């Protein structure tokens, strides 16, 4: 099945939800706050890829174990299938000038494969897209921003700098961003992107034909080619899905009752090969281990839309919070997430909010590094 309309995917987590055992605090935004020293927010990747710590949380036994990520194979259930997100981060942030000379930043939010170029009257390519504009003065419809090789015309404006725009350029758009663009590092990384980020803020299995995410699926950053090969030699399966990570992944939940939060949507794909691998694992009783919240969102979003895992292309805006019953993911590999974030709420739905926050407290006390370039967690 190929779904092309956002209504074909589940909007929220009501499908499969059972709130009878959910505490009131699970729905309160205040229930997702925790203290984190500033120095434990990782500003750089570890010196060597994969040299991360691993916090293993066993939901059944209640025992938490501290380990190294390179040893993750010794904790994974026998015969498990790992499902990873193979999308690649686009250097989607452009720096330029307004006609008046003022500085402006543009971040392309529309996944690159969904940009549909046409030929304009001036012979250049043009396409409408969604973006984020930051400028010293308010931008208005009709304004045109100039970047190196790219003109951006504002069509409509929305909250928090989001805009509908028409882009004008010559040649290959992907090549233009790859040459001139900057990686949109998360806002809590307080430095400009550097040369090292262009390799380290990508997973080793990301694909050039899946270029278009504005953030990395960070649980995958810990994997090296050697570790991936070793896991497959140990009998673990490997499948890949695609979710173009949107900037909404950094947006905090603002609603005091999280059930009223409007979740951002993201574009995803499950190939026939991946669907077959996942269904085979389920049929054979082999656990499915999702590599990150993005892979988890793909599988649970597809299940919410179709009632099964099958080839799928389309949008998901599923919001997973406590009370949700997981249908596909049996275990999750993930990083440590921001307070009050939808990602922390998803992990709390999987492992329990109080137990998750207790684990986070232990990780803080043990000096774990947090967020995108930080350490990892395996939830069994």
From Swiss-Prot:
Substrates-to-products reaction catalysed: 7-aminomethyl-7-carbaguanosine(34) in tRNA + S-adenosyl-L-methionine = epoxyqueuosine(34) in tRNA + adenine + L-methionine + 2 H(+)
Cell inner membrane as a keyword?
Answer: no
Subcellular localization(s) per the UniProt record:
Cytoplasm
> What Enzyme Commission number does this protein have?
2.4.99.17
Q: Which SUPFAM superfamilies match?
A: QueA-like (SSF111337)
Gene Ontology molecular function, alphabetical: S-adenosylmethionine:tRNA ribosyltransferase-isomerase activity
- Swiss-Prot/TrEMBL GO biological process terms: queuosine biosynthetic process; tRNA wobble guanine modification
Q: According to the UniProt record, where is the region Disordered?
A: 1-24
- How does it associate, per the subunit comment? Monomer.
Similarity field? Belongs to the QueA family.
The record's annotation in PANTHER family points to: S-ADENOSYLMETHIONINE:TRNA RIBOSYLTRANSFERASE-ISOMERASE (PTHR30307:SF0)
Q: What is the official name of this protein in its record? A: S-adenosylmethionine:tRNA ribosyltransferase-isomerase
Q: Encoded by which gene?
A: queA
